[in-house]
């Protein structure tokens, strides 16, 4: 069938996608660049200007539906916020992700000289990263569209999450990864028995390949579109990315229905930071929390810092780079939402900075040794950048600050293996322990 742009679109467009009936709180898809509007469908690029599409909501309808009381009666997962997510019915692919701890970090705050510091600890998700939020959203929507195969391009955590959720949903699964990925992340995908395809190239090359496959595999012999493979971060990207808004909703609720003053989040594609910003904004617009400017700061590794570079040099574009960093989950050299993340940081008075691999390792150790949380390299980037921004005076001492920790360190043990102590080797007797300890009881 020909799906048409919504009636009030600035221009019309047609495509071969099968669109489902639009729920009353969803208006459709809208281009972030030219504003063209489309029906709800598995579509991610504007036909008129090739800009990215995102979900548009009927906020009057959401305001009628939602309230603090309705939210608090919901499940203790990300799905307590379903009124704000692009899924029509009950979530069909659900591992109970979300509602992870907001941990008050008094020890780290004292060391950095901050009055009030929290981490949003998304290592507590089902596959130990924030990706469970976006995957649950995307694949629940994919089931509504009638897709039977789940797929993704991934730097690791997304592959783990897609494989797990596909197993839960009874969907076939293909995950495409760079061939140099950490072994922990590869094993954490293989256990769910997906088809894992290791591509000899970096993430950006893997992503381009997946875009080609998505276009080819979802057309029949006559060239007509059919919903076969749901690439969560390609043809399902507008729905997938909305799941990150729950990172804002949870923080606001856990802080007592208020937004923080400042957040620091890692930047890979840039999508997460933009959606955290959108989430706070939606709740302010609907009166669920008081209006304020939340300073949005981003963190990158020096070896893959195109957004930080654009921020520092005040560029109106993000120049692609070739990644070379231990923070492989952030190694996206051509970030799709990088320019939007940069603009948000500038608009809110935040900052985007980058740190060296050595600082990343120290960031991992600092969080572990002060607050007992073992983060992967992306979290090391976040903590090291947090420290750098505080020392530069870009985060105020009295600002309530939240740092987003997006994945667990068990997946990236290689990064720190040579930078921590070794076990004491002793014989099984007290004298041997006293000798190794250097003291006697």
What are these regions (language model features)?
Residues 2-441:
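PLP-dependent amino-acid enzyme catalytic core
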């Amino acid at each position: 069938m020909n799906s048409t742009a919504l009636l009030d679109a600035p221009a019309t467009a047609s495509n071969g996608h099968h669109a489902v009936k639009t729920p009353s709180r969803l208006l459709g898809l809208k281009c972030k660049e030219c504003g063209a509007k489309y029906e709800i469908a598995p579509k991610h690029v504007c036909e008129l200007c090739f800009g990215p599409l995102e979900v548009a909501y009927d906020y009057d309808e959401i305001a009628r539906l939602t309230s603090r009381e309705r939210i608090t009666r919901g499940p203790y997962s990300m799905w307590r916020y379903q009124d704000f997510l692009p899924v029509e019915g009950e979530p069909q692919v659900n591992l109970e992700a979300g509602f992870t701890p907001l941990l008050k970090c008094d020890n780290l705050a004292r060391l950095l000289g901050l009055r009030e510091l929290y981490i949003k600890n998304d290592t507590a998700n089902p596959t130990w990263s924030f990706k469970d939020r976006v995957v649950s959203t995307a694949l629940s929507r994919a089931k509504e569209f009638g897709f039977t195969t789940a797929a993704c391009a991934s730097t690791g955590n997304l592959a783990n999450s897609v494989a797990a959720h596909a197993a839960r949903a009874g969907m076939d699964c293909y995950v495409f990864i760079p061939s140099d990925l950490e072994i922990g992340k590869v094993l954490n995908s293989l256990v769910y028995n997906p088809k894992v395809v290791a591509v000899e190239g970096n993430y950006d090359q893997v992503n381009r390949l997946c875009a080609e496959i998505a276009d080819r595999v979802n057309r029949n012999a006559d060239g007509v579109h059919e919903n076969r493979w749901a690439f969560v971060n390609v043809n399902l990207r507008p729905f997938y990315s909305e799941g990150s808004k729950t990172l804002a909703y949870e923080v606001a609720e856990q802080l007592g229905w208020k937004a923080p003053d400042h957040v620091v989040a890692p930047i890979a594609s840039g999508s997460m930071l933009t959606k955290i910003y959108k989430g706070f904004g939606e709740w302010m617009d609907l009166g669920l929390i008081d209006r304020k400017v939340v300073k949005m700061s981003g963190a990158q590794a020096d070896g893959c810092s195109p957004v930080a570079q654009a921020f520092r040099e005040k560029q109106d574009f993000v120049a692609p780079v070739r990644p070379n960093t231990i923070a492989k989950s952030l190694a996206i050299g051509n970030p799709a939402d990088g320019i939007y993340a940069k603009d948000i940081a500038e608009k809110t008075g935040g900052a985007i900075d980058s740190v060296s691999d050595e600082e990343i390792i120290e960031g991992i150790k600092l969080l572990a040794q002060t607050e007992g949380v073992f983060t992967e390299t992306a979290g090391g980037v976040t903590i090291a950048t947090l420290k750098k921004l505080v020392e530069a005076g870009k985060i105020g001492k009295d600002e309530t600050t939240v740092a987003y920790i997006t994945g667990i360190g068990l997946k990236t043990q290689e990064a720190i293996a040579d930078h921590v102590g070794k076990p004491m080797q002793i014989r099984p007797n007290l004298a041997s322990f006293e000798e190794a300890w250097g003291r006697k009881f």
